[in-house]
């Protein structure tokens, strides 16, 4: 039962799953995973919430706790992907990649604001910058103004000083012990952890 807020992406994913697993019944549900969703669960059958990738890191710890607690009400088991804490140099290289993939992703926010909200951002006047904040345990993504200028958004105008940043995104990292503790606070008792050989990423199996 795949869930996504984008109907087009959801339908494409559901079609792909159906092709790859023809014996699997795929029931797509359009919704925001951060809010309660009415999911048709068949009684008597075990349910597992699968939250792959490292999306949970885009939530604050408080939001992650709320999401885990909400999911526990849907299923007694979860599989959750978590990006682990690691050498800050590795994190810096990943979020400031030489190919510029992350920079393009971050700068695309300005294009979307222009298109969807009618602003007049010039992406050429900003550069991408990301760094690890050890006190908060997170990567912070920013867009840095390359020069002093102003931007119009609706009836408002916002002035940027050279070097001023727009804080666009956070990506929280956890140690295995930290995430196990967070899951326990959300009501999950049993925890299994699988990691890659380098200990960069983990899959947590949670049982309520």
Question: Where are each of the predicted segments found?
Answer:
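A short linear hydrophobic-aromatic micro-motif
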Residues: 189-193
């Amino acid at each position: 039962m795949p869930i996504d807020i984008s109907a087009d992406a959801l339908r494409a994913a559901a079609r792909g799953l159906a092709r790859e697993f023809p014996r699997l019944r795929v029931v797509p549900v359009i919704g925001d995973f951060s809010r309660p969703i009415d999911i048709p669960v068949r009684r008597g059958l075990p349910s597992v919430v699968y939250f792959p990738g490292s999306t949970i890191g885009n939530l604050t710890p408080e939001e992650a706790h709320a999401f885990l607690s909400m999911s526990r009400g849907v299923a007694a088991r979860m599989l959750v992907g978590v990006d682990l804490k690691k050498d800050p140099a590795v994190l810096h290289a990943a979020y400031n990649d030489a190919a510029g993939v992350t920079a393009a992703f971050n700068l695309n926010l300005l294009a979307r604001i222009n298109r969807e909200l009618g602003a007049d951002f010039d992406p050429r006047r900003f550069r991408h910058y990301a760094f690890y904040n050890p006190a908060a345990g997170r990567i912070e993504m920013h867009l840095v103004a390359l020069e002093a200028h102003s931007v119009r958004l609706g009836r408002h105008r916002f002035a940027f000083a050279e070097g001023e940043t727009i804080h666009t995104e956070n990506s929280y990292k956890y140690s295995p012990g930290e995430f196990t503790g967070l899951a326990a606070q959300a009501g999950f008792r049993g925890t299994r952890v699988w990691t890659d050989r380098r200990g960069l990423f983990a899959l947590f199996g949670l049982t309520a």
